[in-house]
Amino acid sequence: DIKGEIEIYPEFAEGLEGLEKLDAIVVVFNFDRSEGFSMKVTPPHRDTECGVFASRSPRRPNAIGVSTLKLLSVEGNIIRVHGLDMLDGTPVLDIKPDISGGFFEKKG
């Protein structure tokens, strides 16, 4: 897994308040460099085809990606994460708390 940073426009930095208390975040983004799509894909590390909706392929009909990332830190308008699977400069559409383990569980 890759560590990386998500840079938020400075005018949205205030909206990050409290994010640092979380263990993980969900990032919704746009596959802006993906061209076209196929309903059947062969995912990396697999030998067989499957339907696009049964995969994490970036070549999707709607070009929307969603990743759950481990939150490392928040400093100003920079979010440091682990598990990054986006290209540099990928447009981030939204950031939400990961509530799969319970709503607003504290880091511990």
Language-model-detected regions and their locations in the chain:
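Glycine-rich, low-complexity intrinsically disordered segments
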Residues: D1-G108
